[in-house]
């Protein structure tokens, strides 16, 4: 184990130590000689100074200040000393004093003389006061009727540019006769143009017509969501409630409305989730339906907020939650399919016919054949019903089969094959040619050469209902 050395602290200067430790007697041995000038170098200079004069050279153990007189430069003449003289002050103007004016300046102006007081007037009369009484015969009535004044009425008209009241035009009496001529400056003959109308919605289209006036060229492929990346944690959810109510796995709340095809966000809280696999989930992205390993899979990406920094940034892993809805079984395991009859007969006594039976061994239930002519077509007298239990006489119609195109002839109990084929006019077969895949009916366009440069790519697995976050 390597020992760690303590950091070295710088000691105070010798001058500071000498001030505090000289009186206490705790100074280090190198402080007092350095301050008092009793070091070995100082003693050597003192001993050598007894025989050699070194004054004025500034040789010593102190700072290099050149002694009391300073360093004297060698060589060169001395420069004249320049004394800076400041600007001269303006002179003080002294006002002259005349011979008749006093030399003493008075500080307070002269004021008028104030009398000490006026004499008190004297009254002459009898003893006491004289009282005089009087009675008024006129009642004190105040006239409160206001005086008639002049009233001035003024009016001001202000026009508001935001609202101008439309003026009211008084209808005037006009002429009612039949000779009224109206002429305008734009009167004249105007021509018109016939524009042919085109049908935009055609029933004979191929379905590949562009739906906009400027279609986007090329083929745009939507990249499949990378749900099985190494950066995602794979968690399987066995509860089918994950499809309809995914929030029940994150929080204990039961919202009234929860969209199942959108991204769900949750507030980060310290409470424990109902399902431990959904702990610290703050977002569940839109679902995606995929097919993987023979099953239909329902997937959602979840974002966790395991850590939160002081700046507010949340850090967490991305988890892929998936639930297998149903397995996809191959057709080889279910080759035998039992077919149920769509119509059942209520009459079990009706005879059944075998379409592969020999017509010679079938009991004769038909009437003699009718001759066929090209101009007449026999019509049956009664309709033949296999499931009919009514005993009625039936008549079959013989229709000759044409063998010009080498059609296969089938026989059965209800199909009669004639022994001699009628004579039909022979028609030459149409010439067989190999039709190309693309037929060009004109020379006013050409195929885009870039079609031949498109390479086939590997077919990817189909994905549906993925949002932007899942796709990338």
Swiss-Prot record:
Keywords linked to the UniProt accession: Capsid protein, Cytoplasmic inwards viral transport, Disulfide bond, DNA-binding, Host endosome, Host Golgi apparatus, Host nucleus, Host-virus interaction, Late protein, Microtubular inwards viral transport, Phosphoprotein, Viral penetration into host nucleus, Virion, Virus entry into host cell
Q: Does the keyword Chaperone apply?
A: no
Kindly state the positions of the motif Nuclear localization signal in this protein. 1-12, 453-461
Q: Which Gene Ontology cellular-component terms appear in the entry? A: host cell; host cell endosome; host cell Golgi apparatus; host cell nucleus; viral capsid
**Which Pfam families would you find in this protein's record?**
Late_protein_L2
Where is it chiefly localized? Answer: virion
Q: By its UniProt entry, which InterPro entries does this protein fall under?
A: Late_L2
Quote the PTM field.
Highly phosphorylated.
Name the cystine pairs.
Answer: 21-27
What molecular function terms (GO) are annotated for this protein?
Answer: DNA binding; structural molecule activity
For biological process, the GO terms are: microtubule-dependent intracellular transport of viral material towards nucleus; symbiont entry into host cell; viral penetration into host nucleus
Intracellular or extracellular location(s): Virion; Host nucleus; Host early endosome; Host Golgi apparatus
UniProt function note:
Minor protein of the capsid that localizes along the inner surface of the virion, within the central cavities beneath the L1 pentamers. Plays a role in capsid stabilization through interaction with the major capsid protein L1. Once the virion enters the host cell, L2 escorts the genomic DNA into the nucleus by promoting escape from the endosomal compartments and traffic through the host Golgi network.
Complexes and interactors: Interacts with major capsid protein L1. Interacts with E2; this interaction inhibits E2 transcriptional activity but not the DNA replication function E2. Interacts with host GADD45GIP1. Interacts with host HSPA8; this interaction is required for L2 nuclear translocation. Interacts with host importins KPNB2 and KPNB3. Forms a complex with importin alpha2-beta1 heterodimers via interaction with the importin alpha2 adapter. Interacts with host DYNLT1; this interaction is essential for virus intracellular transport during entry.
Q: Which HAMAP family match?
A: PPV_L2 (MF_04003)
Q: Which family does it belong to?
A: Belongs to the papillomaviridae L2 protein family.
Q: Under what name is this protein listed? A: Minor capsid protein L2
Query: Which species does this protein come from?
Result: Human papillomavirus type 26
Q: Which gene encodes it?
A: L2
């Amino acid at each position: 184990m390597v020992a760690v050395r303590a950091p070295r602290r710088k000691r105070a200067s010798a001058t500071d130590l000498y001030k505090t430790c000289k009186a206490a007697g705790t100074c280090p041995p190198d402080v007092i000689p350095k301050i008092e000038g009793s070091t070995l170098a100082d003693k050597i200079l003192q001993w050598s100074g007894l025989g050699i004069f070194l004054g004025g050279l500034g040789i010593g153990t102190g700072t290099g200040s050149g002694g009391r007189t300073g360093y004297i430069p060698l060589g060169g003449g001395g420069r004249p000393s320049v004394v800076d003289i400041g600007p001269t002050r303006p002179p003080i103007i002294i006002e002259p004093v005349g011979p008749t004016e006093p030399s003493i300046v008075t500080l307070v102006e002269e004021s008028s003389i104030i009398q000490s007081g006026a004499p008190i007037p004297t009254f002459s009369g009898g003893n006491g006061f004289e009282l005089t009484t009087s009675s008024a015969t006129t009642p004190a009535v105040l006239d409160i009727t206001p005086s008639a004044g002049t009233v001035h009425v003024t009016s001001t008209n202000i026009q508001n540019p935001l609202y101008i009241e439309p003026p009211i035009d008084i209808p005037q009496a006009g002429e009612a006769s039949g000779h009224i001529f109206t002429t305008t400056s734009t009167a004249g003959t105007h021509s018109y143009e016939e524009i042919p109308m085109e049908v935009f919605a055609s029933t004979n289209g191929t379905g590949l017509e562009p739906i906009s006036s400027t279609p986007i060229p090329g083929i745009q492929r939507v990249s499949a969501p990378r749900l099985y990346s190494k950066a995602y944690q794979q968690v399987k959810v066995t509860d089918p409630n994950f499809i309809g109510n995914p929030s029940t796995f994150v929080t204990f709340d039961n919202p009234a409305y929860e969209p199942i095809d959108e991204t769900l966000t949750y507030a980060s809280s310290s409470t424990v989730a109902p399902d431990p696999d959904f702990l610290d989930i703050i977002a569940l992205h839109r679902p995606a339906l995929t097919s993987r390993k023979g099953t239909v899979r329902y997937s959602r990406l979840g974002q966790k907020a395991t850590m939160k920094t002081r700046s507010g940034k949340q850090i967490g892993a991305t988890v892929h939650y998936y639930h297998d809805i149903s397995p996809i079984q191959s057709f080889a395991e279910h080759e035998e399919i039992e077919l149920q009859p769509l119509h059942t007969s209520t009459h079990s006594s009706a005879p059944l016919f075998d379409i592969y039976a020999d017509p010679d061994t079938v009991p004769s239930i038909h009437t003699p054949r009718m001759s066929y002519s090209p101009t007449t077509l026999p019509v049956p007298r009664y309709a033949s019903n296999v499931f009919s239990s009514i005993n009625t006489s039936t008549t079959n119609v013989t229709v000759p089969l044409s063998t010009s195109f080498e059609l296969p002839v089938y026989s059965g109990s209800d199909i009669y094959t004639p022994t001699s084929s009628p004579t039909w006019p022979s028609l030459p077969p149409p010439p067989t040619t190999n039709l190309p895949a693309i037929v060009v009916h004109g020379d006013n366009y050409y195929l885009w050469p870039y079609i031949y440069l498109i390479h086939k790519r590997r077919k990817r697995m189909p994905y549906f209902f993925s949002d932007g976050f899942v796709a990338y």
